[in-house]
Amino acid sequence: RPFHWFSWYKKIKLRRFKNCRPKSIYEKQLINDGIVVIPNFLPSQEFIKLKEEYNQIILNSQKLKIIEKGSVKIEIHPMTNKESKKFPMMENFSKNKELIRLISVGEGINPVEQIKNFDLENSSFGDPQDDSDQNVQFHCDVHFDSHKILYYISDVSEEDAPFIYCKKSHKNNFQRMWYELKRGQLEDSHKDSYRIENHLDKKFFANYFKKITEHKHRVIAPENTLIIANVHGFHKRGEASKDKKGSIIRIPYRYNPLGPSKSIPADLYNGNLF
């Protein structure tokens, strides 16, 4: 319900005020726009060494997880705190103070000493017509503030499936609450496959979609670019041309006021509760 949702929103703001207030330009930008993009995040020599470690880990990985979504193939190596100790640059990255502060400000939590887990991720793209990844349509991950951190290990052009975000769409204003109320009346609102673009035949959703996409930001950027986005806002994975490849470090990070999502039925967690 919008009332409970707004109550959580106030708690997040109070938690942020208490634990980690925004100070830097980037931290304030993350709160205001819902996304911050930082080029040349690491010094060039440090990034070169990190990329060498990245390639070495992927090449020798014994625990590579492979996900296929039609013509898209994603190879994921999960990095743990224990494993990162064997790789100095990965260890430094997991302890990067600027990165940790940005996450802490966004989530409203006390800064930690080290990020415990993150993923090394290689993507290969086939025929766009056979791409079955649902995330090529705009969506929001959850009903409360949570963050997605993407660190480009390779250059990302228009054809390399760039991350796309609608700035300020994370804000819990009246328009967003009204959208959630209207969305909750749709038959598919509780499904993971729900996408606003499937309902543009309805005037309200068409108008709302037009409004949020006026501030669409396509993150086309070189390697060594850091992206942190509040995925309560609308975002998507851009389309990729055939035979394109990409490499990133991904850190999903979310504070969940409902507790672990696995303990809650999927339909309730995703929509019906609201």
Where are the regions a protein language model picked out?
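Short, charged/polar surface micro-motifs in flexible loops or helix N-caps
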Residues: 99, 109, 127-128, 143, ...
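Non-heme Fe(II)/2-oxoglutarate
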Residues: 11-12, 175-183, 225-274
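Double-stranded beta-helix
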Residues: 159-228, 234
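Active-site region of the double-stranded beta-helix
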Residues: 112, 139-142, 153-162, 168-170
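Short, conserved beta-strand element in jelly-roll/cupin
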Residues: 141-158, 220-221, 252-255
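Non-heme Fe(II)-dependent double-stranded beta-helix
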Residues: 1-32, 39-136
